[in-house]
Amino acid sequence: MATDTAPACIHVALRDGVRDLRGEQVACDAARFLGIDTGRVRTSRLYAVGRNLSRSDLERLGREGLADRILHEVTVGGRPESRGARTYVLVGRLPGVTDDEGMSAQATMADLLALPPGDGAQEVFSSEVYLFERDLPPETLARLAEELLGNPLIHHFEYGPVPDRIAYAPRVRLPPPAPPRFVDLEVSDAELERLSKERVLSLDLKEMHAIRDHFRNPEVRARLAALDRPGLPTDAELEIFAQTWSEHCKHKEFNALIEYHDEDTGQTTVVDSLFRTYIRGTTDPIAARLSASGQDWLVKVFTDNAGVVRVDSERLFVLKVETHNTPSALDPYGGAITGILGNNRDPLGTGRGGARCLFNTNVLCFGPPNYARPLLPGQLHPRRVLEGVRRGIEDGGNKSGIPTVHGAIVFDDRYAGKPLVYCGTGALLPSRVGGRNAWEKEARPGDAILMAGGRVGKDGIHGATFSSVEIDRNSPRSAVQVGSPITQKRLADFLEAACLAGFVRCTTDNGAGGLSSSVGELAPLAGGAEVHLDRVPLKYEGLAPWEIFVSESQERMTLVVDPVHLPAILEVARLHEVEVSDVGRFTDSGLLEVFHSGARVASLDLDFLHHGVPSKRMRATWRAPALTEPVLPPDLDWGHLLRRVLASPDVASREWVIRQYDHEVKGRTVVKPLMGPDGTAPQDAAVMRLGFDDWRGLAVSCGIVPRYGDIDPYAMSAAAFDEAVRQIVAVGGRLPDPDASGGTWWSACDNFCVPDSAWHPTENPDGDRKLGALVRMCRALKDVATAYGVPLTSGKDSMKNDFKEGGVRISVPPTVLYTVVSGIEDIRRTVTSEVKAEGDFVWVLGRTRDELGASILYRLLGELGANVPRVRTDEAVGLYRALASATTRGWVASCHDCSDGGLAVALAEATFGTGLGLDLDLGPVLDALGDAPHPVLSALFSESPSRFVATVAPEHQASFEASLGEHGRCVGRVTADPRLVVRARGAPVLDLDTLDLLSAWRTDPRGGEGA
């Protein structure tokens, strides 16, 4: 790739005297994290203009289109005023990387100057310029550029003494692509493995053999001979197989035949597909019970881009949660923004299309921000990953007009190699679209294949296959993408209008694998497809046909359209400024055929493409670790411990993240992430209003506790699902009742992220034990979800979450996230977590047990323990139903679930921002603990699941006690004195100022206080 380095340039900088907050942040971070004294830092924007404009037009564009007249000064050509700066760094995008700001500036230029339309190619490019007061040497400037200001995978850097002219325009100049070629698979096994690795196919030897044997088939050879071609796959066909058969798309390990051996019991069982046994095996029986009782809200599960449930006769709710772990490890900002935008497209591409995104969620797992171990080559520091991912999620949601309403952050050293980035989206879809059921998908022979949205480039090539392997320093740059929220917003608005008008038969997104995936998945609906790649709009010339077909360039959808509607849909696209291209037709040939400039580059049998992948056979083992409870000192300071727990990274406030996300856009958020009189108290679940013509809403929550898996993955998975469910119950949700009429709809999404679990005697000798952990996690999911009657509607697995370099492997702990959404009949009856009034009674609901194993407290004490928290569904179901009934009757003033840190944390959090306190005696809790060795410690910090802290106004106390008495005990009152006072059968335990506790909780895990 080549670049133009002398375009016309417009510099937009803050005027002297205007505070440069970005520059101040850079100076602070450089000193704090890199130990570099930059002096004063000034920032500016550089816009390189490729069009031949007069100087007066350039000046007008800068003044009227790109700058604020009060805040900014504009310089055309040269550089911004240096004002004493001695060195600089320019951060621009590499050729071909998405430049949303540049494209927006280009649209502004066209509108402002009334320019004739171009050919769609980018003509304006944006960059950032940093001017430093200090005379910094080149090696220091390089560190600033690569470790703080940008990422070499996606950015171009220039630095040195401040020159007279600063300019950069990343135009792409690719050599002509190599012609399509045939790939000889009649080679040795070693050569097949080398081919798979070099082309980033991520296919194992058995799969390479299957492809080779397919092309040996006499019928296949005869069909290909009739096309006047040899019986060998083309490079495009090999890439299509790799995409379609990738772990990302085919979920081969979740569908494998697994021999599971329990070394503790000596029993061996065979699991024929984790998915069919434990996930579909959970939902299908629940669906049958719902159907038998006349409940019809479970509409579509597992067969589309997202799960669909019925809200009422007019509306459907669509839920999807995806992961974007590998891209976020390479480029945290780009990985996160493409993750959330890509996940938005899943609901948009469900059924016939026409959904409107309602909310986003994000759950993030990072290495600790103060990670002190030496970084491996290619490994980014967790602090940098955290900030990049946070910014990506912020821009992905805020700039798309979608509120980010719920989430969580988990810290653990084992996420320092590869973070886990879970992106969730809920959407509303009309029940009928274009006079037909909205959830149905269909394609007919002769229907047009349209591609709508962004153009295609090299970005994202091999994203699907690359996500199926561990990462290292040699991970391919082409797998990285950067999203465009503006392009996607236009695309979403266009799609909604076109679908509701009845112009679209169905749609799907161009996600992993691009056109190869979207057309390949839709083709069986009609019986075949024919695609012409020369009709696909490109960002730049020089892409090989196979690259065009598998590229994952973002913000694209594939539409199935009756040709009679083509003029109408193209007009809708014009009105929404969305590029739409007619790239082919669906057929009934039984083939996926791909052409470029008249030449056939792929002709594949659809049946073999989708069903020919060999099934895996895997081995899994389990043995419970030999653990004991620690011996603790007798003189522990409970108040000091509580402050430490509140300040710990996994418990401390997330306000430093929450305040940067927009959770209010759309005006439907009822229960927000932080509530209370001063917006400080953390909430258990988000509640949103569905519309403005009634009081119906929904609650969304999540559950994730990977640390429990260090003792027992079964207990971890069960606790995570219970957490997600009880958080919804805490705000006023009701458990579903599959055996009764008139139940409330629920939708749950499972997302498993595990390290490489495929056993290999030398490369992965403990793979069988990691797979054994996954089997236990899935078993727990089925047991708990079945007991609660909550169906799984969609999900995703990510199976290779490892970073390996120089013989060192950093693997994530087995992790599962459950995202759960439930209908709320009346949002006016929902409850928040903070206490409300002096004199209210305080209840602890659910039984506290001696279950400190893997707790936050034990982690702070450097212990693991043995008594892991375990879910007892028989107790939980009764409590959840009784609490929901009491909430519906208006008896509950506040309710907060007990989770990370236990009861003591829940009590403290319930007071935050209220100016109120609690006066409690935990005698009833101690009674339930029996002969626990450290009863007060367990009462305060045990993380037994299925528990709540609730408050009840005096006028409702008798009714509440009659309804909930068997499930909990009253332990005290809310007071006007802002102190947390706790006794144990009269003996003092805690007497703490709640403002001091709030201060501890607001510790910023990145370092410092004042979250």
State what each model feature region is.
Residues 25-82:
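Acidic (E/D-rich), amphipathic helical modules within compact regulatory domains
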Residues 69-118, 123:
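Short, solvent-exposed interaction modules
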Residues 11-22, 53, 90-103, 134-137, ...:
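Short, surface-exposed ligand-recognition loops at beta-strand->loop->(often short) alpha-helix junctions
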Residues 12-14, 47-55, 91-93, 129-138, ...:
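Short beta-strand-to-loop capping motifs
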Residues 24, 28, 56-71, 99-111, ...:
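Non-catalytic interaction/regulatory segments
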Residues 3-16, 43-48, 83-95, 126-130, ...:
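Short glycine-/aliphatic-rich beta-strand segments at the starts of folded cytosolic domains
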Residues 39-43, 111-129, 133:
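Interaction-mediating elements
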Residues 96-98, 118, 131-133, 151-1011:
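Glycine/proline-enriched, intrinsically flexible loops and inter-domain linkers
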